[in-house]
Each structure stands twice: as structure tokens, then as C-alpha cells.
Amino acid sequence: MPAEPIWPFDNSYARLPERFFARVRPTPVAQPGLVRLNEPLAEALGLEVAALRGKAGLAMFAGNRLPEGAEPIALAYAGHQFGQWVPQLGDGRAVLLGEVVDRDGRRRDIQLKGSGITPFSRGGDGRAPIGPVVREYLASEAMHALGIPTTRSLAAVTTGEPVLRERVEPGGILTRVAHSHVRVGTFEYFHWREDVDALRTLADYVIARHYPELADDARPHLALLKAVIDRTAELVAHWISVGFIHGVMNTDNTSLVGETLDYGPFGFLDAYHPRTCYSAIDIENRYAFDQQPRIAHWNLTRLAETLLPLLHEDEDEAVARAGEALNGFLPRFEACHHARLRAKLGLAESRRGDIDLAHELLDLMARQQADFTQVFRALSDERMDDPDEGPARRCFARPEALDGWRARWIQRLRQEGRPEPARQAAMRAVNPKFILRNHLAQWAVDAATERGDFGPMDRLLQVLTRPYDPQPEAEALAAPPRPEQQVYQTFCGT
């Protein structure tokens, strides 16, 4: 019989002042069932897989039983949602059980999402349908496999209870793992209340836990702002490189550690267009694909505003220091973005004209409605000695439209003289063959919601956790959607 799961909890956030959170227990559910346990992640966290698969483990994932050492809390935060200020949000359907120190010595949050009402529920039921649980599990693990900093999914369970949204749906709970759940909105919460002591405590906490190298800096809070700016710029550049659209880049979904946080109405590009926006609630396309760098800077500006009292006692000097830090965002983003563009094109060296060459390709893709992921993957398979019939041409409605650009690209590749096998391998390592296409996510959600069938979820996880591998047996899952499979809108659904 499996032993009781042992969680090595050490809950630093729960030791902060009480105004940072509300103490609340998860609400038990009627008949939990284990959908998926992320065994590699469990092992990395130092947890015993066999014990987690037992009845006691299931009860913990369902919120029916607290593991020893847990101190469940719902975090307080505020935020700008679609540019509009909301002074109190907080964890309305999630409970942070505590923190564990993993096998690499890193502190990780363990959160139950969909675990019942909290003081921040604002009239909601605190629950989650199984569909969004499946979506987030798939998305977070796919993003991790792509090499993008992200929260992770440790487990998904059904609750045996219905959840009423636009229709009645089966309930679910996700166990989310994160390096941090501190957001820009956490700082905004105390800034709006003019609680400078709390802001200082929070900033010092973030430095001590996530940026310890800044502790001895002469201006640690300014250094913190700059570090968050750098990590956020790097994160968004990484999103752009794989065609990811977050969909709801509110300040309460902007992590202080450069981690992708919250998978609501997200999506991945199919046909390339820079203004693509799938989110049904984003009626002004505020968070469209090409707007994500601008919005990241806007969110970081809100963070900088909250830190002004900590940057200097003179407001003008504080504003000047914050402004200088914010001016570093665009250069950092462009450096990361351009480096990733070069890598996607197989260019190992930086030369004048490289970015123009990349933009020419993107413009051509937009005009031809070519698939973002397929084009770059096909370029990885191109051979310079193939005069005209390379695989990338087949990605375009008018194959000959690519020929002029392809000739210039091959000429640029020849300037480096890199062996072709090395160039192809390098490109395949950054241009995924498999992404969580919107219609595939919907396939898994529909199967889980309508039939209680988690086979599609399992199949996608097998493939998406190896996104750069050829996997010829999964060729159908690499294909763009057929017209009848197109997903034009995504929803939060929670």
C-alpha cells in the first residue's frame, strides 16, 4: 500500500504579514478522480510518485485532505485588466498550499486551481470546469518542452461535481507549480493602498527569494526593476519566436520572475498575421500577437510606478531612475527577438540586413497566409544545392512567391560556410514541428468535457513534450487545421 505522500514544505510567503493573503482551506469535492499525474515533475520536486498515485495523493490533489506542512492561503493582488484598474482581485478560485524546495534547491509554489471559494471569489463559485484544466495542463507542459519559462502542471483531477458556466460542465482541479505567484498586480495592490511598508517588504521578499544576487546592490530595488524588465523582455521574445499569443496580458497575469503565467484564452498562430488575436474577450485586439511587446512595456511601467517610493525619496529622481530602467526594455527585447529570428533562419553570425531578410519572409507569409510553424520547420529541411523544389515552397499558396526570397537567404547562408547538416540541426532545435494548435487543444477539451475521454489529452502530451523531434507517426498532429477545424476564438472558460 502506498505510503502517505511527504511534501517538503517550507512556506515563506505564509510568513509574510497577514495582509498579503487570506488563510483559507480548499473545499472538499464529492468524487475525485485522477486524470493525469506529471511523474517527471513530481520526481524533480522530490515527491514519491507511488504515494501520489494512492488514495491519499488523490485526496490532496482534490483538496479533500491537506498534506502535512501545508499552510493554505489565497494571495491578495489587484491589477489592470484590459487597461482598466481593478483595485482588488486576488486568488478567487485557487489556494496556495505552500512551497517545496525541489531537488535542485529551487523553491516552488504548489497551488490548487479550482479548489473552491476564497475571500477573493467576488461572487464566483471558486471552481473550474475540466476543459480549462485540460487546456492549461497541455499548454504549460507544451511551453516547457519548447524551452519557454512557464508555470507547470503537476496533476489534473475530476471532482465528480458539475460546474455551471454557459452550460453545465464536469468540474476539475489543476495542481499548478510555479517559481512564484507574485505578479505586477501584487505590487499594485499595496501601491493603491499607499502601503509603502508592504511594498518594501514585498520587494525585499522577491529579491531574497528570486534575485538573491541583487541583495548587496547599492540600489537593490532599482536593480530588481531592471531584472524584471530583462526577464520579461526575454520571455515575450521567446513567445514571439514560436507564435504564442497569451491572450490576457493583464498586470495580474504578469509574473515578477519572467514566467508564463495563466493560460486562459491563449493561442498559437496558424497562418501568420501579426495582428492575430484569438481571445473572445479582447474586443479591441489589445493583446494581439504583435502588440505583446508594447503591452509588456506598459505592464512594466505600472510596476515601476509602484516602486517609486523605494527608488528615491525625491519623486523626480525616482521617476528619472524608473524611466531610465524602462528605456532598457525595447533594446533588450529587440536583442533577444533578433537573435531568435537569426537562429530560426539558421544564421550563426550577426550581419547587416539579417533582420530585413527575416521581415521580408514574414511579410510574404502574411500575404500568402502561410503557416508560421510549418514555414520555419520546412526551412530547416531546405538544402542549399536544391535549385528550386525545396519543402518550404509547398507551404505557400503560390510556391513561386518564395523563390526570390529563398535565393537571397541561401546566398546569406553561403556567406557563413557552415556545414549544411550542422545548420539544419541547429534550425530544427529552434523551429518546432509540433505546437499546441488551437484545434488540437479544442479536440482534447471536447473529448474530456463531453465524453470523459482523456485519450486525446494523453496523445497530445506524448507528442508535445518532444516538439522538436520528427515523430513521423504523429504527422497529422503537425498539420495546420482544415477549414472546418479552424478555431477563430478562444475563451477563458473558467
From Swiss-Prot:
Pfam families: SelO (PF02696). Mg(2+) binds at residues 253, 262. It comes from the Bacteria. ATP binds at residues 90, 92-93, 113, 125-126, 176, 183, 262. GO terms for molecular function: AMPylase activity; ATP binding; magnesium ion binding. Keywords: ATP-binding, Magnesium, Manganese, Metal-binding, Nucleotide-binding, Nucleotidyltransferase, Transferase. Its cofactor is Mg(2+); Mn(2+). InterPro entries: SelO (IPR003846). Its EC number is 2.7.7.-, 2.7.7.108. It is an enzyme of class 2 (transferase). Belongs to the SELO family. Nucleotidyltransferase involved in the post-translational modification of proteins. It can catalyze the addition of adenosine monophosphate (AMP) or uridine monophosphate (UMP) to a protein, resulting in modifications known as AMPylation and UMPylation. This is Protein nucleotidyltransferase YdiU.
